[in-house]
Curated annotation (Swiss-Prot):
InterPro entries cross-referenced by the UniProt entry: Ribosomal_bS16, Ribosomal_bS16_dom_sf
Family: Belongs to the bacterial ribosomal protein bS16 family.
Keyword Ribonucleoprotein recorded: yes
Organism in which the protein naturally occurs: Listeria monocytogenes serovar 1/2a (strain ATCC BAA-679 / EGD-e)
Domain of life: Bacteria
Gene that specifies this protein: rpsP
GO CC field: cytoplasm; small ribosomal subunit
Keyword Ribonucleoprotein among UniProt keywords: yes
A GO MF term: structural constituent of ribosome
Keyword terms of this UniProt record: Ribonucleoprotein, Ribosomal protein
Entry protein name: Small ribosomal subunit protein bS16
Length: 90
């Protein structure tokens, strides 16, 4: 099972709102997910990102790969840096 951390759209037409979820890569974008680990609202200025850092790091250490957009959001929040430092043992 290839696990991805990706966005799941739940907003209405012209008003996108996303959940950051852990899902099997074979599931549809808005389909079943394993766990919800955060939210992303691109309409606010500045954009609103809420992420459960512990759950995200746990899934990434277990082999979950973030999508490109989620990787950018995690970098902006400083989670990718923590993940790389933990992986290198710093």
């Amino acid at each position: 099972m290839a696990v991805k951390i990706r966005l799941k759209r739940i907003g209405s037409k012209k008003k996108p709102f996303y959940r950051i979820v852990v899902a099997d890569s074979r599931f549809p974008r808005d389909g079943r997910s394993i766990e919800t680990i955060g939210t992303y609202n691109p309409l606010l200025d500045p954009v609103e990102v809420k992420i459960d850092e512990e759950a995200t790091l746990k899934w990434m250490h277990n082999g979950a790969k973030p999508s490109d957009t989620v990787r950018n959001l995690l970098s902006r929040e400083g989670i990718m840096e923590k993940f790389h430092n933990q992986k290198l043992g710093k």
